[in-house]
Amino acid sequence: MAITDFFAGEIATELLKQLFTISTTAWRYKNTAKQLLTLIDSIRPTIKEIQYSGVELPAHRQAQIGMLFDTLEKGKKLTDKVLSSKRWNLYRQLTLARKMEKLEKTISNFLKNEVFTHILADVHHLRADTSVRLDRVDMSLDRVIQQVGSMKIGGGGLISEAMKRAEAMEIETNDDSEKFGVGLELGKVKVKKMMFESQGGVFGISGMGGVGKTTLAKELQRDHEVQCHFENRILFLTVSQSPLLEELRELIWGFLSGCEAGNPVPDCNFPFDGARKLVILDDVWTTQALDRLTSFKFPGCTTLVVSRSKLTEPKFTYDVEVLSEDEAISLFCLCAFGQKSIPLGFCKDLVKQVANECKGLPLALKVTGASLNGKPEMYWKGVLQRLSKGEPADDSHESRLLRQMEASLDNLDQTTKDCFLDLGAFPEDRKIPLDVLINIWIELHDIDEGNAFAILVDLSHKNLLTLGKDPRLGSLYASHYDIFVTQHDVLRDLALHLSNAGKVNRRKRLLMPKRELDLPGDWERNNDEHYIAQIVSIHTGEMNEMQWFDMEFPKAEILILNFSSDKYVLPPFISKMSRLKVLVIINNGMSPAVLHDFSIFAHLSKLRSLWLERVHVPQLSNSTTPLKNLHKMSLILCKINKSFDQTGLDVADIFPKLGDLTIDHCDDLVALPSSICGLTSLSCLSITNCPRLGELPKNLSKLQALEILRLYACPELKTLPGEICELPGLKYLDISQCVSLSCLPEEIGKLKKLEKIDMRECCFSDRPSSAVSLKSLRHVICDTDVAFMWEEVEKAVPGLKIEAAEKCFSLDWLDE
C-alpha cells in the first residue's frame, strides 16, 4: 500500500465532514453538497479497504489513485473556501457553486471508468493470497505436530524451537488501537526500506517503553512484502531483561543452519546459499546480549533488534516516535468513548487537556483513556489536576509515564489495585498462569473465585493486563491452569515502582525486578531485621546451600520461586514461613529440575496451594509429613517418577484435605496410580495432555466427592472404567482429544448429576442407550459427524444443547 492511499482515505473523511456542514448551513450549495456527500460516502469503504489491505499496487494504478488523491485534495480546499465565504458576496458564492458542481461531475466521471474495478481485483488477489498463506501455515503446523509427536514433552530446545517457529508463522488480527496511526505505516515503510536495500546485517527499532516498538515489529513480521522478501523464513524471539542467552543462541542457530537447536553452536562462517532469513529480537536490553545473539556469520541473514535503547548504528535504526496530537486524540477517544472522536456535548478542551498529559505515548493513552471510560466530566477534572501535578524533575517520557499510570489506578478499589500490584511478582516477558494468579488473589485478599475472576476482567478492560483469548475462559467448568495472562513491560515497571517504595523490610511485596545470579545485596544487608512482606518473589538461576542467607518472614503468605536450572536447593527460610498459604515453584530451564531439601515442607502447616512446574516430583511415603491443609496441587511438565506408586502408600494421610489435583503435560505418567483414589476429599481431578497415559485405576468409584473429571488430550487412553459411573456427584466429564477412546461406559446413565460432557475429537461409533437417563445433562460438545448420536437424548432431556464443535489443534502449551 502506498502512503498516498492512506492520505486519500483521511482526506475523504475530512471532506465528508465539511460537506455535511455545507449541506446544513449554506443553502446555495445544499443540493450539490448532498450529492457529493452521498457519492464520497459510497466510495469511502472501498478507499478504506485499499488503505488497509497491505497491497502494493502497480505503477499505473498508483497513478490513478494519485489522480483521485489530487481531486479529493482540491475538493477539500474548495470546501474550505465555501465555508469561509461571506453571505453578501453573491458573485463569489455563484463562482464557488459552479466549481462544486464541476467537482461533483469530476468525481462521478472518475467512478464510471474502470479504476475501481482494477483496484477491487487487487483486493481480491490479496484475499486469495491470504488463503494460500493460511494453507501454508496449516501445512507448516502439521509438520510441527509431526515433530512434536516424536518428542518427549519436556524435551527442551527442539520443542521450544518448534514453538517459536509456529509463533513466527502465526497470523493474527489486532484491534484498531493496536494498529493505530499514520506513524505505524510510515515506520513499516522506513524499516522495510532499510532491510530491503541491504543483503543482510543488523537493524534496529528503538524508542521508549510503551511507544509501539513491539507492535511495529509484529506488523513487519506479518507484512506481505516482508514475508515474500524472506520467503516466510522469519523467526521472532523475545529476549527480555534477563535472557537465557545460550538457549536463545541455540534457537537462532537452529533456525539459520537448519540443524537441531540442541547441537553445539560453533562460531564459524558459512557460505551464502541464496536464502534470505529474518531474525527479529524483541526487547533487547544490553549491547552484550545483542553481541552474543548476533555473533553468527550467516550471509543473507537480517537481524531486526527492538530495544528501548539505541543498540545499533544510527543510520540503521528507526526511532519510533510518539503519536501526533490528532492521532493521540483519536486513540484516546477510542479507548475512552469507543469512537475516534470526541462525543457531542462532552467538553472538548477537557478531553484534549487530559490526552495531552499522555504526551502522545500509545500505552499511556490507552490505559488512561480506558480508566476514564464512562466517567462524568467532574471526575475527568480531578484526573486532569492529578496528572498536571505529576511532572517529575526528570522530564523524560519514561518518568512521566509511571506517574500517569499511577493516576490511572486511582479509580480502582483497594483490592483491585492490590491485585494489579501483585502482577509485579512474576518475571518479565513470561506468560502468567491464570490459575496461579487466581489462587494468589483468593488466599491473599480473602475473596472467592468469582470475585477474583471479576477483578481479572476489570483489569483487562482497563488495559492493565492482557487476557488471553480462549473460548473456555469464564465458563462454569473451565480450567485455568493452561490459560495465561500477560502484561506490558511498562505496566510491570509501574507495579514494581509502587511496590518497591520505602525501606526493604517494610514492603508488603518483596520482589526481584529481574533474574539475578544471587539474591539482592540490600536484602542481605537488612536481614538483621525481619521482613513484613506478604508476597516474596525470587528469580534466580541455580541456587546452592551457600547462596542462601537467613531471612525471617513472619507474615509471608505467598512465595514464588522462579529459576532456570536442572537442580535447585530450596531456601532454608521456608521452614520458618509459618503463615505460608501459596507456594509456586517454576523452573524456566530446558529440563526438569531436581529439588533438594524438600523436608522443609514439613513445617508448612497452613499451605493451601502448591504449584510445581518442570521439576522432579519427590518420592512420597507413609513417613512423609502430612500437609494437612493443602487444598490444591498442580504438577505441570513434571517428572512424576512413580511418586504415588509406593506399596501401601496412604495418600489421604499425607493430603487429607486435597480437593483439586492437576497433572498436566507429564510425559512419564503411564498409568494413574490407584493410591490417588484414596483422596476421598477430591472434588476436581484433571489428568491432561499426558501422551503416555493408557490406564485408569479400577477403584475410581472411591472418589465419592468428585464433581469434575478432566482427561483431555490423553491419546493413549483406550477405555474408561465402568467405575466412573459410580461417582454420584460427577457434574462435568471432559474426554476431548482422547483419540483412542471408542465409547462411553455403558452405564453412564447412572450419573444423575452430570451436567456437561466434552467429547471433541473422540472416535466414537456409538452412544450408550442409558444416556437418555441423564436428566441433569444440559450441554454436550462433540464433533459434527457424531452429533446425530445425541438426537434421541436431546428429545428425552429438556433444555439439552448439542454443540458440534470445529476441530482445533493448539500448540499454546509450548509457548514458554
From Swiss-Prot:
Protein name per its UniProtKB record: Probable disease resistance protein At4g33300
Native source species: Arabidopsis thaliana (Mouse-ear cress)
One of the record's GO molecular function terms: ATP binding
Record's keyword terms, sorted: ATP-binding, Coiled coil, Leucine-rich repeat, Nucleotide-binding, Plant defense, Repeat
All residue ranges annotated as the RPW8 domain in the record: 1-149
Entry-linked Pfam families: LRR_Zer-1, NB-ARC, RPW8
Family: Belongs to the disease resistance NB-LRR family.
List of residues binding ATP: G207, M208, G209, G210, V211, G212, K213, T214
InterPro entries the record matches: Apaf_helical (IPR042197), LRR_dom_sf (IPR032675), LRR_Zer-1 (IPR056845), NB-ARC (IPR002182), P-loop_NTPase (IPR027417), Powdery_mildew-R_dom (IPR008808), WH-like_DNA-bd_sf (IPR036388)
GO BP terms in the entry: defense response to bacterium
Source organism superkingdom: Eukaryota
